[in-house]
Amino acid sequence: MKRLFFITLLSFGSTILASGSVKKPNLILIMSDDMGYECVRANGGTSYLTPHLDELAKTGARFTHCYSQPLCTPSRVKIMTGMSNARNYVQFGVLDRKQTTFAHLLKKEGYATCIVGKWQLGKEIDSPQHFGFDESCLWQHTRAARDQGKDTRYPNPHLEINGQAKDYNNGEYGPDVVTDYLCDFMERNQDRPFLGYYPMILPHDPFRPTPDSENPKSKDGTRNYRDMVAYVDKMVGKIVSKLDELGLRENTLVLFTCDNGTSGAIKSELNGKMVQGGKRQMTDAGTHVPLIANWPKTIPVKQVIEDLVDFSDFLPTLLDAAQSPLPTNLTLDGQSFLPQITGKQANPRKWVHCYYRRGKEKAQQWTRTQRYKLYDTGKFFDVYQDRLEKNPLSTLTPEQKKVRAILQGALDQFNPNKEATGTDLFANGDFSQWTTVNGQPVQKGWRIEEGVVHRYSKGGDIITKEAYKDFELSFEWKISKAGNSGVKYRTQGKLGLEYQVLDDVNHRDNHISSHLAGSLYDLVSAPKNKPLLPVGQWNQAKIIAQGNLVQHWMNGEKIVEISIDSPEWKDCFQKSKYKAQNEFGSWTGPILLQDHSDPAWFRNLRIKKL
């Protein structure tokens, strides 16, 4: 990870209460509406005044590569659930009521939860409460955006407070009303941890003057948009000032981002170049958004972080900041960026993903690094050289070919139309095709819940009844903190080649490179920069064993490859604990899931004979 400063490690901040207990940090997530990366002066934008946001960036961290969805509802669904839209997007203006949100999870951890601003995720009167929010002050909850031809969000807004309609008729300004409600919520809950989620109304069109505009009758859309961005900044400043007033500032993580790019009607200047807004587009103009994180005495100051951030990353980050475990029964695509902003050991993501479907149109998808971007159509762009994506690359360098292969592997993970290949090793939802190593039924220590195979207590290794030699095995895994497990293949008894499953950060074996996650255990080390997700999150894995060739894959990237008859193999084999085993690595045998005395989870185990 590249940073433009020297990091001084700081202790993880928290407030000590009079009782001696530790109060979990408060969490504020602010998401403006239609305000791209170029709209913040700290990012190099010069068209707008954003002093409060700039101060948060100066005294905290800002990211240069945060990517949203191209439109509001898709981004709201993704940020609240931590999942790609490919998994759970239903339609515009709707959040599937079966989904779990960060509000649900934080509420279970004792947080008071509040949402203010724009809803647009379902018109059921109980929607905010259903999705985990104790309190709400919202526009476009059960009512339409317009009433008798007039917009209802800005002057004299039509809102709903905790499900009750409230119309204002004395010149009140919608953004002021909802911001004041959030500030009041913080004051009422200052003695307990709270989550304040503020998907803003501003600066979405119609572009109208704000209470601070010089000309209250202005019809100049560009000027009015500029004033609306300034009012976004003012609302952020009001919230931060309230935290200061309450003495909560040092125990509150404040995050600011935006739901998508700027409106196409707006041109802005960024680093001396004019940028046309691109809301609804899959380009940077539609998806490159600001991200600022601030937490005094916990986040080092003046950080400029070039790591990638996906909108699915906010949920695990909030849970991480709350020191709360991620649920084991959810599929999450995000990973916490808290280590980056707090100056701790981090494992930056290698790519981000966007899935976008408008109405009944066919969905579009891409995966990207900071520089390169691959669409599901096969078009591959160097975004540094071609920001508007006019000229897809045709002739690739070896390095570009490698990046493209990684991005294709990532895309394949989210292809809803891709048929699962191979035989499901738990097709019956039980252990009928598995035994213990000594041939007994699997009766203790292992269980299956909602398709997840969970090693939860001592039960011993388990193996398939069928033996395999040449195959492709795909599976997902996650491990407990400081945990160890593995998937063995070409086995005899408990011996065999092993795809290592490990908490690389906390396990005592983490000083041995060939014992780290994804490695061919005790033989071939996975690279340090492998795309491993943190403890508690699902990693996708693949093992290919065909003849003498052995490959290990992790989250779409090949991390181990070796030929059993090669000089490299002979060298590492002689240094391993297996050196006395004749024909080791060439046996035909069962697939083995290891019981290494730690909780471990596996799912979607599918094998295809080669």
Predicted regions and their residues:
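Short loop/turn segments that connect beta-strands within the blades of beta-propeller domains
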Residues: D376-T377, Q546
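A ubiquitous, low-specificity "background" feature that marks scattered single residues
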Residues: T8-L9, Y168, P211, I239, ...
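Formylglycine-dependent sulfatase
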Residues: K2, F6, A18-D376, V383-E419
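N-terminal leader/targeting signatures
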Residues: M1-K2, T8, G422, A427
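Hydrophobic, well-ordered secondary-structure scaffolds
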Residues: S11, L27-I30, G556
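Carbohydrate-interacting regions of secretory-pathway proteins
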Residues: A145, R404-Q408, E419-L610
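Bacterial N-terminal signal peptides
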Residues: I7-T15
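Conserved hydrophobic/aromatic positions in well-ordered beta-strands
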Residues: D54, I292, K379-F381, K488, ...
